[in-house]
């Protein structure tokens, strides 16, 4: 997979790292991140490390505190986050992974690692940023610090969050935006969001996540994220060609707006059917459908 996308022009691979004991749905620990990162580095690619700071992958609806950090106050949690980030990133760098960027949190519009108070989230971001800067300095590498948001359809809230980072002088380099047209708007909305953030906050921007379905059929006996024609983005069918058109248009829109690039997420997360009784029982435990 890595070799194939590199041959087609991909420059950066996206490896995410969940800490602690997972709930299923795939567990990307440090060892896995190293293995994937080494594979990408082998083909001349840079790697983006995405810290979710959770035992389960994080998004606006799920920002669970790791079980190992439960009961900590914000100062203790910030220290734990700093140490975890520094230790993990140091291991990854020492393993020879060509890290070009680190996301400190994943889709943090509504909170991060169990914290919903914006002041506490900023403390965690500061701790994560300091850890990345330390690891970068120790390794002699130039590594971008990224903050990752989604829901560009609510730019008012996104502006509030980014203004808070600016006022409190949070140290970061680049803003990542998730963009799925069936949830977040049109290509013009994406372009406008990128241009607005670049001009208003003087930060680089990239599309941290994008994907589109090539079929609306159920492949694993559980519900799909996007189901039926009513859920699809206008102008893009649930087909191989529709998927290709959407990805090309997102790339074009991002480039036109001055974005640094785009990550397709998640290109290998496909059903492995059939959805029989034996497989379904395993998927229910490990999350190979509902996650």
Task: Locate predicted features.
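N-terminal substrate-binding region of glycoside hydrolase catalytic domains
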Residues: 1-42, 46, 52-80, 176, ...
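Active-site beta-loop-alpha junctions enriched in small/polar residues
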Residues: 5, 52-56, 104-109, 148-153, ...
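Short acidic/His/Gly/Ser-rich catalytic and metal-binding motifs that mark active-site loops
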Residues: 9, 55-64, 110-113, 214-221, ...
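Glycoside hydrolase catalytic-domain groove-lining segments
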Residues: 134-144, 159-231, 248-260
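Aromatic-rich peripheral "rim/lid" segments of glycoside hydrolase catalytic domains that contact
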Residues: 192, 196, 215-228, 232, ...
């Amino acid at each position: 997979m890595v070799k194939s996308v590199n041959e087609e022009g991909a420059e950066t691979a996206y490896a995410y790292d969940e800490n602690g004991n997972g709930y299923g749905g795939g567990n990307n620990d440090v060892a896995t991140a190293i293995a994937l990162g080494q594979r990408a580095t082998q083909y001349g690619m840079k790697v983006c490390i995405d810290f979710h700071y959770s035992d389960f992958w994080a998004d606006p609806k799920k920002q669970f505190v790791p079980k190992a950090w439960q009961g900590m106050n914000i100062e203790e949690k910030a220290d734990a986050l700093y140490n975890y980030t520094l230790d993990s990133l140091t291991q990854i760098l020492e393993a020879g992974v060509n890290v070009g960027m680190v996301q400190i949190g994943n889709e943090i519009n509504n909170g991060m690692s169990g914290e919903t108070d914006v002041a506490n989230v900023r403390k965690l971001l500061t701790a994560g940023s300091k850890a990345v800067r330390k690891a970068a300095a120790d390794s002699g590498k130039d590594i971008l610090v990224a903050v990752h948001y989604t829901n560009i359809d609510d730019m008012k809230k996104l502006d509030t969050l980014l203004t808070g980072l600016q006022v409190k002088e949070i140290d970061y380099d680049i803003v990542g935006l998730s963009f799925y047209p069936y949830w977040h708007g049109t290509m013009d909305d994406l372009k406008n969001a990128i241009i607005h953030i670049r001009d208003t906050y003087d930060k680089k921007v990239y599309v941290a996540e994008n994907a589109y379905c090539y079929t609306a059929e159920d492949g694993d006996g559980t519900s799909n994220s996007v189901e039926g024609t009513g859920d699809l983005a206008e102008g893009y069918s649930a087909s191989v060609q529709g998927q290709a058109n959407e990805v090309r248009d997102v790339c074009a829109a991002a480039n036109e707006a001055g974005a640094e690039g785009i990550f397709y997420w998640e290109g290998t997360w496909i059903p492995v059917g059939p959805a029989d009784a034996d497989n379904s029982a395993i998927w229910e435990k490990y999350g190979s459908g509902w996650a």
